[in-house]
């Protein structure tokens, strides 16, 4: 089976623009892309939050209450629920003083996957091994 | 001049704000500007908070991003939309948006 690795890099903070949301919805769409591929082909998306993009991963968003829009937290949780591999740059959450226990977790929705906190070197490896890289 | 400045970005506005002077300066952190009031990069508060100014942060934009009053630097006052309207009409002669 021929699988293609895709890297989605989210580097913009949440909500002021649609950028972060677009990155996540594009990544989630991997579930339906099979219909456009030949038999035996598939894609493996990986989502990486770096820089100010790690702000998207702080939990307890109240965007529906305040903006009337689906929260980025919901998109992250749904991504975990469909078994997307998602990575958060450890250097960046440390730099911004974001404790790991403040990050989004989809365990309450029954997701097996969790946000994986990794050093940037691991994200660099993901970039190196991906056929296509999408920056949001 | 009494100048109120809406700060709605985290990284890109620091230099501009740093150059602004006014008889009375108010920095109102909204949208992604709220991270100036909450994030300590490498253990240090935003350099904007070192300015001589009054600082405000919009509660609704904090909550949207999963942040609470407890995350806010003690130099910054948490305000709601109604308070911001009062600031615009009562406290500042000119308002700019960065």
Per-region residue spans from a language model:
Chain A
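Short internal beta-strands
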Residues: 44-53, 84-92
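Short, basic, glycine/proline-bearing loop/turn elements
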Residues: 55-62, 105-110
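Short, glycine-rich nucleotide/cofactor-binding loops
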Residues: 8-25, 57-66
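Low-complexity intrinsically disordered segments
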Residues: 93-94, 108-131
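Extreme N-terminal starter segment of soluble prokaryotic enzymes
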Residues: 2-7
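A glycine-rich helix N-cap at a beta->alpha junction
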Residues: 63-93
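Trp/Phe/Arg-rich N-terminal binding region typifying the photolyase-homology
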Residues: 33-34, 51, 72
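Histidine-anchored nucleotide/phosphate-binding helix
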Residues: 20-42, 47
